[in-house]
Structures are given as C-alpha cells and as structure tokens.
Amino acid sequence: MSETATWQPSASIPNLLKRAAIMAEIRRFFADRGVLEVETPCMSQATVTDIHLFPFETRFVGPGHSQGINLYLMTSPEYHMKRLLAAGCGPVFQLCRSFRNEEMGRHHNPEFTMLEWYRPHYDMYRLMNEVDDLLQQVLDCQPAESLSYQQAFQRHLEIDPLSADKTQLREAAAKLDLSNIADTEEDRDTLLQLLFTMGVEPHIGKEKPTFIYHFPASQASLAQISTEDHRVAERFEVYYKGIELANGFHELTDAREQQQRFEQDNRKRAARGLPQQPIDQNLLDALAAGLPDCSGVALGVDRLVMLALGAESLADVIAFTVDRA
C-alpha cells in the first residue's frame, strides 16, 4: 500500500473480516455464560484522576447550557458500569470505544476498542481464570502462568519491591543503565514502574500469557487492599508476547476510601503541575448506595486481535488509525 494513499484503511480487508469474527466470538463467550452486554456513554462531566492517564476534553454548548459544560471522552467505561452494578444489573460486559490523549505507535492508538466486564461475587483469582479461558479460546494459546508482583521482581531483578527503599530501587535501575532517569525521580511508584517496564516485562509472557498479581498497595487505583497482606492490592495485569493485554481488580466498594484516593491523585497531579480533574460524584454515590462485591477487568481488544492474527502493529487490525482518521 502506498504511503500516500491515506484514504485507504490501514488494515487489510481480510484482517478486518477476521477481526469481525473475533468480536463475534467474544460476544458468544459471554452470551454462553449469561453475562449481559451493555452500552454506556462515551462522554462524561467527570473523568479519571490517575496521574498517568490523559483524557480528551471537549465542550458542550446547547439549550440551557449557554456557558458550556466541559465533557471528557471516557478512558474506560468503568465508572458507568459500576453504577449499573450498584443498580442491580448483575454480571455485565461491554465492547466499546475508549480514548486516551497519549502516545501512538505499534501498540497504541488514541482511540481504541476496550472489552470490560464485571463479575459480582467473583474474587480476583476466579476472574483471572475466566480471563485465561477467554485468551485460550481467542488466541489458541497455552494456559497462563501466574506470578505475584513480588515474585516477578525477585526473579528478574533480585529485589523485593515491597520493602526496597528508593536508594535500592535506584541501584537496581543502575544495573539496567537507567540511572539518567532514576536518579532524579523522587516518586517510589514511578521508580517501581520504570523497573517493571524495563526489567520485568521483557522476560514474561513469552511462551504463554502471564498474570502478574498483588501489585503494591500504593498502586491499588480502584482495587481493594488485600486483607491477608496490607502491603499489596488485589489487582492483576496480563502480559503476552511483550504486550500488556489486561488490567483487573477485586473492586473497591468503600465510597469514602475511593474519594480519598481520588483526592490524593489530584494532590499528586498538582505537585507535578498537571491539571486537577473533576471527581465523579455519581460513582461515589453509587458506591455509597452499595456496589456488590465484585471483580472486573479491562482488556485491549485491538492488541488481542493483533496477537490472534500474528500482526506486527495495531495499524494492521484497525480500519483507520488516528493518522488516517
């Protein structure tokens, strides 16, 4: 395909046909399990507070709103889906567009397809098993292996991420020739993420999908803290062939604690010179009303299709990437 023929799709028609078949297979997977498909808004008056996520922002001007209302394209359908769960919908899944104003490349596009689902009364491990079932069905891969975050660091970096101080983390970074970044970084979780990305990720999920679970409590996000070890959160991620595929939680149900985490995120944003984000009060109200004990996971569909087709880039499985949109 000529590089100048930008009117043409980035993916081939045969690949788009295969993609459609995978989307249908995903829907059958959940239909067979009695999980309800839902649709939620792509825009919201509130957004994520995570310091590592950057949402797109737009402005609505219409009848009754002459001054305009700020709206954010959703980075994930999580908040709306939790409101449905609190309203009593039962197990749900969604295939939807999500948007992040971040990088673009082989594994990233600002607009992408997300598969997100929630299972009331599932703990983290039971949901991990279901994710594994889906991956085996779509990718025809081996059953996954599982490592705790602590085990992964000890195996590949010979350091305990739960007890190491910042000096020890910088020493580990120096062994990876990352001192130019690590020596000026004061945030411990950013150091851990640097080590994980550069020192752990390249070694996991080569032959089979790998679950990494029990992330540090400081990286809990919207996950519960483990009742067995308060140093870790009931959160997991899935990696396969160099790609992060999914991120899941045993979901936090405490509205007050969730609000405190959002506020802490905004304080971190302010310290880094980033804009503070509006907190989703509707989500907090839903948690206060009673979110059922549940686990949920978000999975990147474009990356899943890329792996299933043996493609080299998301551009091979997306009809029009952002540079052709």
UniProtKB/Swiss-Prot annotation:
Changing residue 118 to A: No effect on activity. Changing residue 112 to A: Partial loss of activity. It is an enzyme of class 6 (ligase). SUPFAM superfamilies: Class II aaRS and biotin synthetases. ATP binds at residues 100-102, 109, 244-245, 300. It catalyses: D-beta-lysine + L-lysyl-[protein] + ATP = N(6)-((3R)-3,6-diaminohexanoyl)-L-lysyl-[protein] + AMP + diphosphate + H(+). One of its GO terms (biological process) is lysyl-tRNA aminoacylation. InterPro entries: Aa-tRNA-synt_II, aa-tRNA-synth_II, aa-tRNA-synth_II/BPL/LPL, EpmA, Lys-tRNA-synth_II_C. GO terms for molecular function: acid-ammonia (or amide) ligase activity; ATP binding; lysine-tRNA ligase activity; tRNA binding. Keywords: ATP-binding, Ligase, Nucleotide-binding. Its EC number is 6.3.2.-. One of its GO terms (cellular component) is cytoplasm. Disruption phenotype: Mutants have a reduced pyruvate oxidase activity and a reduced growth rate, and are highly attenuated for virulence in mouse models of infection. Salmonella epmA and epmB mutants share extensive phenotypic pleiotropy, including an increased ability to respire under nutrient-limiting conditions, hypersusceptibility to a variety of diverse growth inhibitors, and altered expression of multiple proteins, including several encoded on the SPI-1 pathogenicity island. PANTHER family: ELONGATION FACTOR P--(R)-BETA-LYSINE LIGASE, LYSYL-TRNA SYNTHETASE. With EpmB is involved in the beta-lysylation step of the post-translational modification of translation elongation factor P (EF-P) on 'Lys-34'. Catalyzes the ATP-dependent activation of (R)-beta-lysine produced by EpmB, forming a lysyl-adenylate, from which the beta-lysyl moiety is then transferred to the epsilon-amino group of EF-P 'Lys-34'. Can also use L-alpha-lysine as a substrate, but probably with lower efficiency. Cannot aminoacylate tRNA(Lys) with lysine. Homodimer. This is Elongation factor P--(R)-beta-lysine ligase. It comes from Salmonella typhimurium (strain LT2 / SGSC1412 / ATCC 700720). The gene is epmA.
